[in-house]
């Protein structure tokens, strides 16, 4: 004679695996935000703000709302969209190397990805058009770069030079120029500074590649550390960031912004200690380098933007 628990088990329908169970709206939203990787939103959001400041047209009236809308577009919406596209493109590789991730584990279905991609694209395009045709152009170009980075046949992420350039230009240069164009016509000075900080950001993109050297080597991804080794790649990171900032300093002096140039120079000098530590052991000093040298770099972006606006 079976007990009550046995009868209950026999009469109850089998439970679905976790990833097969219906998701609530709250769970859908949480999974979507996880897929959009909020930790990546800072760079384009900051660059958009710097571009807006560099325009010299940013005030404390209705333009603040316009600024916040643009920052929301650059960070959570468009950067989030690029992360969704990248995870979708990597789903087969992740199923082998990182099966716990959202898409290969089944926590996020492909239908979820398609809907989220469509929603983010629509929101991003709508905001971009509202902010102006030039902003819409930079957004469209950034989306093309995101697709070229992640999807075949280009899949730029397979090569450190190409992939890092696509991301650096999108996250820094295009975001900066979109921020400027949202408030005033672009100037040659602002475009030049945006491109120089994009050059430096190419080095910053390499910092994330040191922790995945082994996996990248196995998968045939030719990141900068894979191609040149840890020490040389670390030197290239520091050199690229330094050259970009030295050029910014020189141009700011040349254009008659000595205070901004001096601030950027001080911030660059302060990077010397974390730079040396990073070169000695890039893998174990990645977090320290991000919190020091790269943070000083982005504060320099703000100083340069304020200088251009003066």
Curated annotation (Swiss-Prot):
InterPro entries membership: Chl_synth (IPR006372), Prenyltransferase_related (IPR050475), UbiA_prenyltransferase (IPR000537), UbiA_sf (IPR044878)
Transmembrane found in the keyword field: yes
GO CC annotations on file: plasma membrane
Transmembrane intervals: 39-59, 67-87, 112-132, 134-154, 166-186, 187-207, 248-268, 287-307
Location(s) in or outside the cell: Cell membrane
Coarse class of the protein's main subcellular location: membrane
Superkingdom of the source species: Bacteria
Biased segments, Polar residues type: 1-13
Region (Disordered) location: 1-20
Keyword Zinc (UniProt): no
Annotated membrane topology: Multi-pass membrane protein
Record-level GO BP terms: light-independent bacteriochlorophyll biosynthetic process; photosynthesis
Pathway per the UniProt entry: Porphyrin-containing compound metabolism; bacteriochlorophyll biosynthesis (light-independent)
Record keywords, A-Z: Bacteriochlorophyll biosynthesis, Cell membrane, Chlorophyll biosynthesis, Membrane, Photosynthesis, Transmembrane, Transmembrane helix
GO MF: transferase activity, transferring alkyl or aryl (other than methyl) groups
NCBIfam families xrefs: chlor_syn_BchG, PRK07566.1
General function of this protein: Catalyzes the esterification of bacteriochlorophyllide a by geranylgeraniol-PPi.
Name this protein carries in UniProt: Bacteriochlorophyll synthase 34 kDa chain
Gene that encodes it: bchG
